[in-house]
UniProtKB/Swiss-Prot annotation:
Keywords: Membrane, Photosynthesis, Repeat, Thylakoid, TPR repeat. Gene3D superfamilies: Tetratricopeptide repeat domain. Essential for the assembly of the photosystem I (PSI) complex. May act as a chaperone-like factor to guide the assembly of the PSI subunits. GO terms for biological process: photosynthesis. Belongs to the Ycf3 family. It is found in: Cellular thylakoid membrane. The gene is ycf3. TPR repeats lie at residues 35-68, 72-105, 120-153. It is a peripheral membrane protein. It comes from Prochlorococcus marinus (strain MIT 9313). This is Photosystem I assembly protein Ycf3. SUPFAM superfamilies: TPR-like (SSF48452). NCBIfam families: PRK02603.1.
């Protein structure tokens, strides 16, 4: 049974029925509608914590979806799952693929920076200061891009950039 038909409460069932009706009435081709249904089912599975099912639905959506914007959203959600599962290399690659489809994704850049910053702290704790500095600089690079796209939206990141001396932009109003 598709996840969208497996709802336990009235509100979820009502929302699903309404979403299905809207999709049917949308003036888009059948392929795009099917891509959206897979995306929606993937999002539902992801929200329920069923990451394997979510990834399957997202992969099917990507096979059908032609819109770069929609593909980027799907890829971003896949990267979030990879990151949650601890597969940081695959998450970084998938975030980059999302950015290649739509460069206006500050949350992808923010999450990439989180991975680089975490790796930098790990290297620092292991006494590998040169490696740590390289990773912190990489985090600063992607975080600077994120802050430029979403000024004021990542105050903790802006603060990190300032306190570590890695801020090379004036985004603080």
């Amino acid at each position: 049974m598709p996840r969208t038909q497996n709802k336990d409460n009235f509100i979820d069932k009502t929302f699903t029925v309404m979403a299905d009706l809207i999709v049917k009435m949308m003036p888009i081709n059948d392929k795009a509608k099917r891509a959206y249904v897979y995306y929606r089912d993937g999002l539902s599975a992801q929200n329920a914590g069923d990451y394997a099912e979510a990834l399957e639905n997202y992969e099917e959506s990507l096979k059908l979806e032609e819109s770069p914007f929609d593909r980027s959203e799907t890829l971003k959600n896949m990267a979030i799952i990879y990151m949650s599962n601890g597969d940081e290399d695959l998450a970084l690659d998938t975030y980059q693929r999302a950015l290649d489809q739509n460069s206006n994704q500050p949350s992808c850049l923010k999450n990439m920076g989180l991975i680089y910053e975490k790796r930098g702290r790990t290297a620092q704790e292991a006494g590998l200061q040169d490696e740590a500095d390289r990773l912190f600089d990489r985090a600063a690079d992607v975080w600077t891009q994120a802050v430029r796209l979403y000024p004021g939206g990542y105050l903790d990141i802006e603060n990190w950039l300032k306190t570590t001396g890695r801020s090379n932009i004036d985004v603080y109003f």
